[in-house]
Amino acid sequence: MHKLGRGHRDKVQQFMTITGASEKIALQALKASDWHLEGAFDVFYSQPQIKSYTDTRHLEELYNRYKDPYTDMILADGITLLCNDLQVDPQDIVMLVVSWHMKASTMCEYSKQEFFIGLQALGIDSLEKFRERISFMRSELKDEQKFREIYNFAFGWAKEKGQKSLALDTAIGMWQLLFAEKQWPLVDHWCQFLQARHNKAISRDTWSQLLEFARTVDPALSNYDAEGAWPYLIDEFVEYLNENGIIQNSQLTDWSQKR
Amino acid sequence: MNRKIIGLEEGLGYMQDGITKIERILEGRPEPPFNSEEYMKLYTTIYNMCLQTPPDDHTQQLYDKYRQAIQGYITSTVLPSIRAKHDEFMLKELVKRWANHKVMLRWLSHLFYYLDRHLIACRSLPSLKEVGLLYFRDLVYRDVHVKVRDAVITLIDKEREGEQVDRALLKNVLDFFVEIGMGQMNRYEEDFEAHMLQDTGAYYSRKASNWILEDSCPDYMLKSEECLKKERDRVGHYLHSSSETKLSERAQHELLVTHVNQLLDKEHSGCRVLLRDDKVEDLSRMYRLYSKIPLGLKLVADIFKQHITAEGIALVQQAEDAASSKASNAAAGVQEQVLIRKIIELHDKYVEYVTDCFENHALFHKALEEAFEVVCNETVAGSSSAELLTTFCDNVLKKSGSEKLSDEAIEETLEKVVKLLAYISDKDLFAEFYRKRLARRLLFDRSANDDRERSILTKLKQQRGGQFTSKMEGMVTDLTLARENQANFEDYLRSNSAARPGIDLTVTVLTTGFWPSYKSSDLNLPAEMVKCVEVFKGFYETKTKHRKLTWIYSLGTCHISGKFEQKTIELIVSTYQAAVLLLFNASDRLSYSEIMAQLNLTHDDLVRLLHSLSCAKYQILSKEPNTKTISQSDYFKFNSKFTDKLRRIKIPLPPVDERKQVVDDVGKQRRYAIDAAIVRVMKSRKVLGYQQLVSECVEQLSRMFKPDIKAIKKQIEDLITREYLERDKENANMFKYLA
């Protein structure tokens, strides 16, 4: 670090903060990209994650800290404790990312296997390392491909075991969370629409297609294809927007300013 | 043998003599024709000269001489004589000169035959005849063809204006144009035909512009027809046959295409008016004129379609107005009857038009179809066309129907009804309503004639396929079987002394799948009837095990003796009504709630029942208070004072409105049908885009109904949830079938 000029030092710091990688990795990546930060990110993300050795004994200790006294699983209390330890709000979306890494089957509980899989994948075997990885996990949400995976994962994770569809309230909560990350101007209208007109559970198809809709159709609906294969609910949503004057002449009128 | 060598001068001289002689003959001068000696002399001279070897070989010079002579003759005599004249006279002169020329060339070719053969063989020169023709073309034709053409066109125009012209002359001139092309039609086509066509165009353009303003549509068409006929005749008389198509097209264009819109849309005599006033002849003419002009014909067909649609809609509107202005139900029903009749008549009328005026042309069939598809899908006073049509059938088929017709007329009517069905898009709705009505007719013995019922089912089967009618046929068969079954039941009763229902009982067993669905109610049967049910069950179990009987009391009829003070009257009532009345054998006076408790019926049903027995025409029960409506606080008593002049009366129970149930049932059926269609399509295609999937489903389903695209979309999503289909990962508009 001492041999680096100030500019380079700053870049290394930035890199480490954003990716959560170690200094050594940061240097490697930056050198490889001739000290261009963006290039360095590309290099870093395209390389397989360097799995640092995780000590299984430490993992056991960690697991035991959180596991429920009566069942061999981490339940709600354990998760709350974990969040506290991590200094992260239990409602924080990063916990969703954690669950995704664990391939958790349902929210508010982790099996031992899921816990182990997740932490090993992230190269975590201590709380310290766990805390360090938090910013990395946040960054994963910025990746388009990963976000889609996490988003689609969220459906299976958030729904009741044995149900095929996701309860509306839960869905709305998840959407609010997810689209706070990935800014979608119509999310509030969507939620209002569902509560006013739909009042039923959300199918997986509708869930996944909504993301595509948010990604590809512009908020003023100028490139929305009414003859397309969008789920029926989304067609209704567009009608709702038009009927209520929210979209007029392909302009999104901002109601928040109209009161 | 020594042949004398003929010198050049001599030879030329001979030649010239021969040519001159012919010229003189043709000019009409006094000149004796060739005698055989002269002829032979000349012929032989030329012959010998051709055989002469160099230095006496003068064939080339002879040839040249010939050429010069022809040229000279043309230049000095032929051309000036033509030029000297004008117009028709010029044409006559031309024709004469041309004829002469051809004769001359023929004679000369014969005379100088060997020259012809020799030269052409040796040196590939144009034949004498060809040379002669070429000269005529280059010297005469080139010079005069413009004037000739103009003269011809002037004559043609004169003839068009009605004057007599010399047709033979024209034919000859035009033959000349063809012949002068020497094997090609280009002289005729470029120098004459093209200009003639242009002139024709201009001529008819002028005429049409005037006529279109002054004449009515029929008159204009008459004139056009005349003109086109005359032009065709013209070809026969003097134009070359190859001109026919082009000429017709040009004339047609100016007369019929340029002003087509003005013509068809003429305010007081245009196509719409002709249709309105049933001017069949004029319309036939219109068809004939436009049958070769696709654009025009389409316009006529469109007007035809609009006209029929408007008339149909007007009929619907009439019925709608009449229905809404009259308060009572009965009158409204009549209007709807009348409407169907009128639509049938409308259809008959315009089918005739299509066959007669429009010669069965596909465009007009289509126009008719499309018009009726609009008309036959209108709603009248809340009833869909499917329902209206079933009501109509009901009236034709039932005993008390308003349609009193002969058997033949009935057959015809049923045929036409089935034809109309083809236009209705919600055929499944028709089938469902039909089944409901059929059920009523069959079960309440209201059908006029079994044969008629079967007849219409046969016709429906022919038109719509076996699947359409299978349930209905099942229903009719059920009744036949039921009669047999009843006979067996009666035998059973006779031979089984233990089996005593106590009442005369007739049971009709219906096969569940065929009949419309009926709610079986939890009616508490009167004791007398309970026994009947038991006895019948006993009998039925001797016939078949493994079948479950569900009793539909709402469809039953009961004959009850009412022992009134004045006299006993037999009452024909429904089973439900009977159940109510029998309660009064045990109690004098009952409240609404008591009746309710004893019978275990719904409020809706009970109100209807009590109303029919206490507030309608026949008041078998008296009600406290004596109001016209039933309320839950009412009390009822047996009305012993009731009487009627008849000994047997029927107490009608107005039927529940089935419409909502039918629509709901059909809605459910459609969901299944859509589901099945999607699966069928995807199973065979494996992978398919959304739009295509939707359109194939629509096509498959259109036999029975017009599916709502949204409904199809919903079913697709349902199938995705049920894991029959999935979206393609790359392209969300593609679906894959999951085995």
Mark where each language-model region is.
Chain A
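Short, amphipathic alpha-helical interaction segments embedded in low-complexity terminal/linker regions
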Residues: 1-135, 142-145, 166-246
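An amphipathic, hydrophobic-aromatic interaction surface with interspersed Lys/Arg
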Residues: 160, 165
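Short, solvent-exposed interaction modules
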Residues: 138-159
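Long, low-complexity intrinsically disordered regions
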Residues: 239-259
